[in-house]
Each structure stands twice: as structure tokens, then as C-alpha cells.
Amino acid sequence: METSKEFEFRPAKETSRSKSPGGIVGRLSNFARNKARHSLSEKGSNSVGGSGGSGFDKPRKDLLKEFHKCKEAQDQRLDLSSIEITSIPSPIKELTQLTELFLYKNKLTCLPTEIGQLVNLKKLGLSENALSSLPDSLSSLESLETLDLRHNKLTEVPAVIYKITSLETLWLRYNRIVAVDEQIGNLQKLKMLDVRENKIRELPSAIGKLSSLVVCLVSYNHLTRVPEEIGECHALTQLDLQHNDLSELPYSIGKLTNLVRIGIRYNKIRCIPSELESCQQLEEFIVESNHLQLLPPNLLTMLPKIHTVNLSRNELTAFPAGGPQQFVPTVTINMEHNQISKIPIGIFSKATRLTKLNLKENELVSLPLDMGSWTSITELNLSTNQLKVLPEDIEKLVNLEILVLSNNQLKKLPNQIGNLKKLRELDLEENELETVPTEIGFLQHLTKLWVQSNKIVTLPRSIGNLCSLQDLRLGENNLTAIPEEIGHLDSLKSLYLNDNSSLHNLPFELALCQSLEIMSIENSPLSQIPPEITAGGPSLVIQYLKMQGPYRGVVMTGQ
């Protein structure tokens, strides 16, 4: 079960075309997706790449034509994106009616000073160019609200930006910026600041003056500290600090009482300030990949809206102090890759909304006696622990759909496993199983059964009842035979039988698996089948079984 993506802090999605971010960011401004009716990229007759004329004269002529059309129609939006222009001619100054100008994905290295005469401009999109500076004339754009400079070559925030005090949304992601000046405090109307994926080492204290700031995205930089003044940004709902070099958070973080999401994954944080308990609007607590050994007592209990808890890849040796109450609102818990050796009895007794629990890669040796009370869970990952026994109460997890128990020390499965009627995926790789219970045949919705790298000698005939099974992995066991009932698996697409040193025969009924696309038989002797057939691969083996057995009239649609 893959969990890392599920628990990832995702304030915004990006594509190669630099679409505007989604979520709160998207609601602030979604202009990057809009296309104007005068976009040159949609007009073949005005294509800059057309033949005839010099490389400079042709685009200049086309742009002038577009400027004329725009002025004649008094259009307020002009899109000149993705046409490989390297410069903007000065007559653009005549388009004073423009409120939106898009110049995405071109080859601009500079802008003309005349752009400062577009005094009605509210949105200016310059993403995916080669800009290293901006003209001072942009300070005249007193109506400009949104400025997108993602994917350029800026090494600093151009000084003129600090003079555009009307700005509400500022995108500077994917540049080479090393610092943000104290003058950022001039942007009193700024609601969204995106400086992700730069080389910034610290934020200025003046950031505390941004009283309107709602979203602050600073991930993938080199921050070593966050100024205490961040606590003055009372409007903040999203603060993304993930993938930096932070060793601590400021105590003032507790003043951000409107905070809904805080991303601090992949830092070097050793402790969380208890003041965070004042952020009672928080819905996600994601601190993956830090150096936490514990949390402040009752921290999660004081955060009543938390639905996602991700404490994975830290140095925890026990569950957070706070008892069952701390998980009342929680839907997803990920504590993968820690040093936890025990699940306290009753810890999930009030977690009636809990659907996903990941305790992979810990030091668990047993499961609590009240495991049967985890009835809301649909996905449970306990792989890479030291479990030797599954409690019979596992049958009470009636909503379980995915169960991952790989890389433990299990010697047998309880027969009650057959009562998990909703189970779709069962992963038992790398254990010490010698048998599979007959009751496995009751799992009518099972699509994936992985039991490779065990000590299994035989399979129950009931395996033929798994009508939904698509992926069956039996490699690296001690199998001596495969039951003929395997021929009933009409949905089976992949079958792994590799590295079974005592497996000499395959049932002719295998030829009835008409959906079979992949079969691995490497390092299994299969003396029943001629070497030249096995050398030809799975497809030839299936055809051989079909021709040699009693099913030679069956048409193999999967081959």
C-alpha cells in the first residue's frame, strides 16, 4: 500500500504548462488557465514560426497586427503565450484598456519600459520565460493584483515588485532567488506569496507586516529559521515550510489561529512548540521526516479538527500522549518508519472515523487485544514489523479492503481471515507461512494475493473460488503442486510461480485462465514440460498445456 503520496502536503498542483495552483491558491486567482480569443498560438496565419522575412521582422509584424486587433476591439485580455517571442515591441503601450496580459512560455529576457503604461492591468502572466529583471516602470501599475513570474531566472526579487502595493497574488516559484528583502512589508494587500523552489535561506521579519496574507508557500528552499514575526500574519490559513533545513518552529506559531494547513515535512525539527495547540482550525498535522522523539502532551487532543495525522519517518518510540481522545476526528494516521514497539490498548477506541492506519516499519511484536474494535478501518498496513501472530479478532474488521502484513514473522493465518468479505488486497510476502487457510476462498472480492517468499508447500483447493483474483504471487515458496481449481480463476491476469524448487508439474486446467497475461516460472524445474517449451516463455507454456491436456478446444483469448 503506497502511503507517501496520500499523506503529502499538497497546497497546489503544477503541470509543465504552469497552470495556476488549485485549492485556496486557485480561488485567489485562476487566471493562468484562461485563453484569450486573440491568442497567436491558435492563429495559424499569424504564426511567428512561419516562413518569409527575417527572424526579427516577422514576429514584430505579427505582434503589431495583434496589438491593432486588440485595440480595435477594445479587448481587455490579450494572450501571447507559447509563440517563442523574444521581445515585446513598444507599441504595446497603446493597449491601455488591457486588464489581463499573458506572456507565458516564450523566450523573453526583458520587458519594455512601455509596459508600465498599461495602467489598468490587473493580471500579468510571465511564467516560463528567461527574465532576470523587471523594468522600474512596473511601479506605475497601480491596479496590478496578480503577478506570475514562475519559471524564470531571477536571482533576487526585483526591487520594483516591492513598489507595486496593489499586489494580492505573487508567484515566484522556480527561480534562483536567494533572499527576500524587508521591503516585502510594503505589500499590505498581499494574500498569496509563492516562493517555492528557490534558494532562500531566511524570511525577513517584515513578513509580519503582511496582515492580509492568507497563503504563504516557501517549500523547497534552504530556510534555517522562521522569524517570530510570522505570528503576526493572523489571516494565514496555509503555511508551507516543507523540504527546508528548519530545526525548530517559532513559539509565535500559536498566534496563527486561522491556520488550516501547515506543511513541515522533510526538515530537521526536533520538537513541536506546545503553542501550536492554539491553532484549532488545523485539519492536517503532517510532520513526516523530521527528528521528533515525542509531541507535547495532549497536543492532538487540543486540535479538534485534525483529520490527517502523519508522524512517519521520525524517531518516535511510542504513541503520542493524549489517549483515545486525540484521535476522535482522525480519518488517516501514518506513523510509518518509527521505533514504536506497542499499540496501547484502547488507543483507537474513540476513532470511529479512522479509515487508514499505517504502522509500517516499526518494532511491533504483537497487536492489542482490542484490535477487533477497529471496525471503521478500510486500509491497514503493518508490514515490516516483528509480528508472529494475528489475533482471531481480526475477523471483526469487516470494512477492511487492504491488508498489508509483508515482512513479518507470521507462521500461520487465523481461519477467521475468511470473514473479511470486503478484502480486495492481501499482502503476506516475506513471512514464515507454511499453509494458507481454506477459508481464504470466501474472499470473493480479492483481486490481489501476494504470498511469495514464505514456506508454503500446498494451496487449498478453495483458491479456485477467488473469482475476482487478478494478481497471484506464489514465488519463492516450497510448492510441490498447484491445485487444478486454479483453472476457475477467470479474472487472473498475472501468476508468479518462480523459485519453487519442488514444483515439477502444472495443472492442465491452467489453460482455462483466459485472462492470463503474465506468468513467471523462472527457477522452477517443471520436469513435466519439455525444456524447449519453458525456454519459450509463459505464453508457450500455456499453449503447451492447452494442447496436451483435455482442453485443446478452448480458445485462449488472453494469448
From Swiss-Prot:
Where are this protein's LRR repeats? 74-95, 97-118, 120-141, 143-164, 166-187, 189-210, 212-233, 235-257, 258-279, 281-302, 305-326, 329-350, 353-374, 376-397, 399-420, 422-443, 445-466, 468-489, 491-513, 515-536
PROSITE patterns per the record? LRR
**Any GO molecular function:** volume-sensitive anion channel activity
Region annotation (Disordered) ranges: 1-55
Q: Which domain of life is it from?
A: Eukaryota
Query: Which residue intervals are annotated with compositional bias (Basic and acidic residues) in the record?
Result: 1-17
Q: Which GO terms describe its biological process?
A: intracellular signal transduction
Q: Which UniProt keywords apply?
A: Leucine-rich repeat, Repeat
Subunit details: Interacts with let-60.
Please state which protein family the record places this protein in.
Belongs to the SHOC2 family.
Function noted in UniProt: Acts as a Ras effector and participates in MAPK pathway activation. Probably acts as a scaffolding protein in a protein phosphatase complex that specifically dephosphorylates Raf kinase and stimulates Raf activity at specialized signaling complexes upon Ras activation. Required for vulval development. Involved in fluid homeostasis. Plays a role in nicotinic acetylcholine receptor (nAChR)-mediated sensitivity to nicotine.
Its protein name is Leucine-rich repeat protein soc-2
Q: What is the organism field in this record?
A: Caenorhabditis briggsae
Which gene codes for it?
soc-2
